[in-house]
Amino acid sequence: MEASKQMRVSRPYKISESSKVYHWPDHSTAVLQRLNEQRLHGLFCDVVLVVEEQQVPAHRNLLAVCSDYFNSMFTLGMREAFQKEVELVGTSYVGLKAVVDFLYSSELELDGSNIDYILETAHLLQIWTVVDFCCEYLEQEVSEDNYLYLQELASIYSLKRLDAFIDSFVLSHFSTLSFTPDFLQSISVQKLCVYLSSGQVQHKWEYDLLQVALQWLTQQPEREVHTRRVLENIRFPLFPEDILLQRVKLAMCSLLPSEANGEGFVEEAMHYHNSLVAQPVLQTKRTLLRSEECLLFVGGEVSERCLELSDDTCYLDTKNEQWVKETSLPARRSHHCVAVLGGFIFIAGGSFSRDNGGNAASNLLYRYDPRRKQWIKVASMNQRRVDFYLASIEDMLVAVGGRNENGALSSVETYSPKTNSWTYVAGLPRFTYGHAGTIYKDFVYISGGHDYQIGPYRKNLLCYDHRTDVWEERRPMTTARGWHSMCSLGDSIYSIGGSDDHMESMERFDVLGVEAYSPQCNQWTRVAPLLQANSESGVAVWQGRIYILGGYSWESTAFSRAVQVYDSEANRWSRGPDLPNAIAGVSACVCALNPRLEEKKKRNKDKCQDRGQ
């Protein structure tokens, strides 16, 4: 060190024992800006890209960092790694210049005149950020005039994101697009089958989709070989019998050659209609409604003093956050059970009067078909039951315990839609009512409840294997409870709320606690408690959350209209849209419903608005 720069004060042995890291947040931006300045002035550029006899200078390091294509070219011993000039084939000067400019500036200007060139270049050079920007731009430009061209573009470059967006666009505009000459002439059989098989396809009724299929098949003679592939996506069983025979069969026979065997689908649908009671176990992809599943509540006791039972079946309209009536029950019920099997809603047992002591118990079983919005009465249970549990498992229903005019029950019986009959199976080890149950991986679990004996409610957890017809004890809950709710979500079984009796006074009190059971570990864990009491509530799992509907508080002697929603990931309860009335003894389920025409129109309009179309 020069004498003039020597310190006058000697440096201490240590300034500080602590260290601090300093960060320059704009460092990468500043470096990129200086590199761009060097490029524009021709400084330190070690490669010149040549396309269409025009040159684009650049730095190899930057190209290799941003592009897998150039990284391979410059590191795998290719001759271009040692060339000053590298000629590119399969791209354009407009596209190359825009992409290289983006690598240096982080800015990309897209418009209708350059999008094709830039997408071509970015795809060739494997610069996926630019490809994503191109897809985002094109998504905003999709219209009824260009969707076929953009769909082909997505196919050429394997743009799954753009392709999925266009599919969604076509589905939401299907009734308009599907009868146009461009669609009928140009759409591929693969795409047509995707649209006709979708539950989201816009249509007024199934016959419109059949007409599209028939018109597409008859556009060109060589399409005849695709007849079965196309028609198997039409849901023939959704047609009423008279429409099947009078319109559908006639249209098939008049437009398709006999060797196409289109009548086989009509015969299959007629067999389905003729097997009315067995329909829940005759389900195929062609019997499913083209709609999303809805959360419903069914029946219940509407008030404490007015002796009023409900016959409402309502679903939650998530768009408007309100409950909408789907249908009326054949008979008013409370403390009944509901299960869904094969897309049909079954309502079993329950009380047909305000007297819920078992004297008004019913053994009736009704079935609701959302496809036709129709109730039918099927075989009654062998025993009248109220305050019991009903499960759907494989191709049957299982009714467990409960009580009636003779007292608490231990019997268990199963219903087969194939035979329309109930059969007794292995009973519970003890009389049980006021319990709760759920299905987990084809096993029936029930917990808690009472048996008419004096004393508190139970902690027991029982598991039933229908294959061996055996009940087994599992680790009991940490909290005794009855009139509670159970459900399965993910790998856990939840036991929720309910009530219990004090040992000394025998006064009833509310249980707000919730616990989760792991069948793998045979262990219970406490989770977030309820927001309010919920004895005799409806419960369902919908869209990955637990819904508790209504209920009763023994401490405040009040019915509830609250909907409590549990998020297992956040371990938190929140409030959902209130029920129309305060209600207890209500059941809940999740099932696909046949949307009304005005709802279909509104749903499709909302989808278009969500996409900014």
Curated annotation (Swiss-Prot):
First and last residues of every Kelch repeat: 294-343, 344-395, 396-442, 444-491, 492-544, 545-593
One Gene Ontology molecular-function label: cullin family protein binding
Pfam families assigned: BACK, Beta-prop_ATRN-LZTR1, BTB
Domain BACK: 147-249
Protein name per UniProt: Kelch-like protein 36
Pathway connected to this protein: Protein modification; protein ubiquitination
TM annotation in the entry: none
Role of this protein: Probable substrate-specific adapter of an E3 ubiquitin-protein ligase complex which mediates the ubiquitination and subsequent proteasomal degradation of target proteins.
Alphabetized InterPro entries for the sequence: BACK, Beta-prop_ATRN-MKLN-like, BTB-kelch_protein, BTB/POZ_dom, Kelch-typ_b-propeller, Kelch_1, SKP1/BTB/POZ_sf
Source species of the chain: Mus musculus (Mouse)
